[in-house]
């Protein structure tokens, strides 16, 4: 099987390098991210997928897009907001839709969360939160859930897309915790789960160890990474 490389920058920021050498960036937030390695930067990207508008998921989208020239894929309202910040290459889409970027098929899935930005003391709605299923060149599919609670239609994500790897939030408080994430793993039918969105802030108390205790008896691999680490 061709190599897939995953680099984690802490929180929910990942660079996934596909078997064909494409770099998919998810939710880039480096500046002010207490878990990001010192001096971390993302200077190569083929596509940037942004799940929702909260600053801990959008903080470096504009910087990375300008540095790399990569298009930004997001729900329509969020893509329009990025355009208002000067980005020219955006792909606005919506739930259930699929687009193709540089040979990668990207489908937008629902998430149960919220999405907004605070500017000049005012909160601006930025469309619904989302997740993504990306079909790689070798046919494998990965599911990046974004920030979400557990929801029953994860079963439909399994039925429609059959992802092999899921990136799931486990920190609790703002998203699901390990117990709900374990049920998500079962509903999705994935072979491997990459925990994210934990330990960044005191409120995010869910841990990878708690998730491992719940899903390893299912035969599911839990990929626990250190910020800045790349796993294949």
Q: For each predicted feature, which ranges?
A:
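Active-site environment of divalent metal-dependent phosphoester hydrolases
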Residues: 32-33, 54-59, 79-82, 97-100, ...
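Active-site-proximal loop/helix segments of hydrolase catalytic cores
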Residues: 118-187
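Glycine/small-residue-rich loop that forms an oxyanion/phosphate-binding "nest" at active or ligand-binding sites
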Residues: 59-117
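Pre-active-site segment of Zn-dependent metallo-hydrolases
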Residues: 15-54, 59-66, 77, 114-125, ...
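Zn-dependent metallo-beta-lactamase
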Residues: 1-23, 30-33, 210-218, 227-230
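Beta-strand-turn-beta hairpins that frame and shape the catalytic cleft
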Residues: 1-4, 17-24, 98-106, 135-142, ...
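Binuclear metal-ion centers of metallo-dependent hydrolases, dominated by the metallo-beta-lactamase
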Residues: 71, 83-98, 182-232
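Active-site neighborhood of phospho(di)ester-bond hydrolases with catalytic His/Asp-centered motifs
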Residues: 25-28, 45-53, 73-76, 142-148, ...
């Amino acid at each position: 099987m061709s190599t897939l490389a995953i680099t984690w920058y802490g929180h929910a920021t990942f660079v996934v390098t596909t078997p064909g050498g494409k770099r998919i960036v998810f939710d880039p937030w480096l500046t002010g991210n207490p878990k990001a390695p010192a001096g971390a930067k993302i200077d190569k990207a083929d596509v940037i997928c942004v799940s929702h508008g909260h600053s801990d998921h959008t903080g470096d989208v504009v910087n990375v897009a300008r540095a790399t020239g990569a298009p930004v894929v997001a729900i329509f309202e969020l893509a329009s907001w990025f355009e208002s910040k000067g980005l020219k290459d955006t792909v606005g889409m919506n739930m259930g839709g699929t687009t193709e970027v540089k040979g990668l098929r990207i489908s937008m899935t629902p998430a149960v969360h919220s999405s907004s930005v605070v500017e000049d003391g005012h909160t601006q709605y930025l469309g619904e939160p989302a997740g993504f299923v990306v079909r790689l060149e070798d046919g494998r599919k990965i599911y990046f859930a974004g920030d979400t609670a557990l929801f029953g239609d994860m079963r439909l994500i399994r039925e429609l897309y059959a992802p092999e790897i899921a990136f799931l939030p486990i920190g609790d408080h703002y998203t699901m915790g390990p117990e709900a994430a374990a049920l998500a793993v079962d509903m999705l039918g994935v072979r491997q789960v990459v925990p994210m969105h934990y330990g960044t802030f005191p409120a995010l108390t869910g841990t990878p160890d708690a998730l491992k205790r719940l899903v390893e008896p299912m035969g599911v691999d839990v990929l626990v990474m250190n910020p800045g680490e790349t796993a294949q």
